[in-house]
A protein has these predicted regions:
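Short, surface-exposed patches at the edges or C-terminal ends of soluble domains, predominantly
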Residues: 1-336
Length: 336
């Protein structure tokens, strides 16, 4: 039997007892995202009704009918919350601490910037950048300063997970090419994510930008068995890739473009082969893989690690494998 569920309560701080204390921070304003006009074509999440239609008959069970589950955009946002439960369960069993889950603005309208209320009892902060760019969420100077101070504490890890940026051009023909490349009817011709995380990266001096929404290559003869990553394991002193061969299949993953030269201080640990049979400006430029996992080791006053990887790899909406669970285990048990 699963534990009883709670909602809309104040966070109870977790004592430091050796295990890593993990927190998830959803960067969205839940009310703003949930109340986007479904008549708008671009830059919104799908409604649950649209999800049910596209994924039929996956959600044609009583738990997802109108008497049990929200049918608008809010229902889709709740799918994201549900999709991290497997990760939370594993993290809790490994660390001995429950995963704390925060939202920038939650369902009840409470706003929570990243400050000491979150950071004081957090060792690994996972920033899931699923706010739309046009929502104009920005990291305040006080948040950047608080995170900088927190990263001076030994054993901290900031995981940044900016999501895809599909259709950022005004060229409608290119938008259509991108759409046909990823092939997901639930992603519109323009869907730009992660304004908050971008502003946070700028403030922290992280030389990375999330761009595109790329369909990963799959194992020949399959439709959604993702191809193995190209891991640079000799650079992976954290051991994030131990017993990890693949990430999660998701038809529109971001490329983490470096805006500074790769170096010991800016390490690309894994690149994902991209699907070459579907044209895309990224592959037409000669690229065959995209950056999927980046590590910025401690440097100067920063004693903590910074890791970049897409939030999709911590959800079960698009499946999950033993390799993925190994990644989770490695992250929550990394040196502290």
């Amino acid at each position: 039997m699963s534990s009883a569920r709670t909602y809309n309560q104040d966070h109870i701080a977790r004592p430091h007892s050796g295990g890593r204390r993990v927190s998830i921070y959803w960067t969205w304003s839940y009310p703003w995202e949930a109340q986007r006009d479904p008549r708008e074509l671009d830059n919104r999440f799908s409604t649950m009704t649209e999800v049910r239609q596209a994924a039929w008959p996956t959600y044609e069970t009583p738990e997802y009918d109108i008497g049990h589950f929200l049918q608008g955009i809010d229902g889709t946002l709740e799918l994201f919350h549900r999709s991290t439960l497997a990760f939370q369960e594993l993290a809790g069993s490994v660390t001995g601490h429950p995963v704390a889950v925060f939202q920038r603005i939650d369902q009840a309208g409470y706003r929570l910037p990243i400050d000491d209320r979150i950071l004081d009892d957090t060792d690994t902060l996972m920033v899931f950048g699923l706010d739309h760019v046009i929502g104009e969420q920005e990291a305040a100077p006080e948040e950047i300063e608080a995170i900088q101070q927190w990263l001076q504490r030994d054993g901290t890890c900031l995981l940044l997970a900016p999501h895809h940026d599909v259709g950022f051009t005004d060229d409608l023909a290119q938008r259509q090419i991108e759409y046909l490349h990823h092939g997901d009817p639930l992603v519109p011709r323009q869907q730009r994510f992660s304004q908050y995380t971008r502003s946070l990266m700028k403030g922290l001096g992280v030389p990375v930008r999330n761009t595109w929404g790329l369909r990963p290559a799959v194992v020949e003869g399959t439709t959604n068995q993702i191809a193995p990553v190209s891991g640079v394991r000799d650079l992976d002193a954290l051991g994030l890739l131990n017993n990890v061969t693949t990430f999660n299949f998701h038809p529109h993953l971001p490329h983490y473009e470096l805006t500074a030269p790769e170096s010991d201080a800016l390490r690309v640990l894994a690149r994902q082969p991209v699907e070459l049979s579907r044209p895309h400006p990224f592959t037409e430029a000669g690229n065959r893989e995209f950056n999927a996992l980046i590590w910025l080791p401690p440097t100067g006053e920063r004693a903590g690690d910074i890791v970049l990887i897409d939030s999709t790899h911590f959800t079960t909406l698009f499946g999950g494998t033993d390799s993925l669970r190994n990644l989770w285990h490695n992250l929550v048990s990394m040196r502290g």
